[in-house]
Amino acid sequence: MREIVHIQTGQCGNQIGAAFWQTISGEHGLDSNGIYGGSSELQLERMNVYFNEANNNKYVPRAVLVDLEPGTMDAVRAGPFGQLFRPDNFIFGQSSAGNNWAKGHYTEGAELVDNVLDVIRREAEGCDCLQGFQITHSLGGGTGSGMGTLLISKIREEFPDRMMATFSVVPSPKVSDTVVEPYNATLSVHQLVENSDETFCIDNEALYDICMRTLKLSNPAYGDLNYLVSAVMSGITTCLRFPGQLNSDLRKLAVNMVPFPRLHFFMVGFAPLTSPGAHSFRAVTVPELTQQMFDPKNMMAASDFRNGRYLTCCSIFRGKVAMKEVEDQMRNVQNKNSTYFVEWIPNNIQTALCAIPPRGLKMSSTFIGNSTSIQELFKRVGEQFSAMFRRKAFLHWYTGEGMDEMEFTEAESNMNDLVSEYQQYQEAGIDEEEEYEEEAPAEHEE
């Protein structure tokens, strides 16, 4: 079966990763030791996409946990599902990257990367037919962004034909953890544009908004945010983990979602989002799910798709859903909001169905959108980047690790190019094809 190897790097990546494993273990009927106690054949049928069956019926996640300091790892190991993971797959340094991309990418991280690759290789060899990798990390810190992108490029070299999906927590406009976030994020995006096949952008601020507005939590903790992210990750991977009518794998998803190779940064959403304890008071319908799923307030990245247009999007419905009803709803959305979809890609909404709903819900839907409005996010980071870079603020932390200013300039211009590519396709219409055909090759010659 088509296996996926999961890699989590840095503090943020490990916390999201831990929440993800907790969620999908529950969906597959595994307890915190990886022992199966479920009731449905469907839970077992594709278990091996994410789990390796060890002896005595224990299922072990195909997960590699990486960090440059032991703290987060110890927390994962001591957490509710700490006994699930293979002990050899915890790889950590002692020094920490100190929110410095250069440390994660060039010095501290580079020392550890070979150990990590050995473990990844071993996991990959245990697969019948490896489909690809997924990485959870944040772009604002040092380890997840610097070492995460280093791992991605190394894996790319070694497994050039496998898919690479990343769940990347991007810095948010108002909530900032560190001053140098714009540097770390820009340097990471520079790598992701080249090396990732699909990047799901998640943003803490949007998650805070969802927690406060929709889930009515007065002061959300990271646990609540991670719960949202794991719901989306579980939704995106649902077609890979359960047999369904319309199955997709990472590659099919990419084929449907990425019209131009560099434009693979997706916005994600999830429905129904109800406050814990409220969902038992109402039944959810497909029209409601669709409505909520396309609601800007539900997007987990703080850019408003009403300022741009969708190139493509994909919706994944789970539960007992009628195919016909879903298709009608999708057609309905497209007709009502036709201005938000580019007209030069017909049928740009893809739908997938899976009969098994998440725990505690009758139905749910996950949304993945490739919208040109994601450029807002890159623009925002880019402005913060150039404000600091112009004054060479904090630059000595990076040059001290052997980086060159040239790299910063390159990363900045690559990100600006990305923004203008999104803008170009946002404005493109059907009628002006001729001029684009001449321009297009020049755009993508990197």
UniProtKB/Swiss-Prot annotation:
GO BP field: microtubule-based process
Alphabetic keyword roster: Cytoplasm, Cytoskeleton, GTP-binding, Magnesium, Metal-binding, Microtubule, Nucleotide-binding
Amino acid composition bias (Acidic residues), ranges on this chain: 429-440
PANTHER family: TUBULIN (PTHR11588)
Similarity comment: Belongs to the tubulin family.
Protein role: Tubulin is the major constituent of microtubules, a cylinder consisting of laterally associated linear protofilaments composed of alpha- and beta-tubulin heterodimers. Microtubules grow by the addition of GTP-tubulin dimers to the microtubule end, where a stabilizing cap forms. Below the cap, tubulin dimers are in GDP-bound state, owing to GTPase activity of alpha-tubulin.
Protein name: Tubulin beta-2 chain
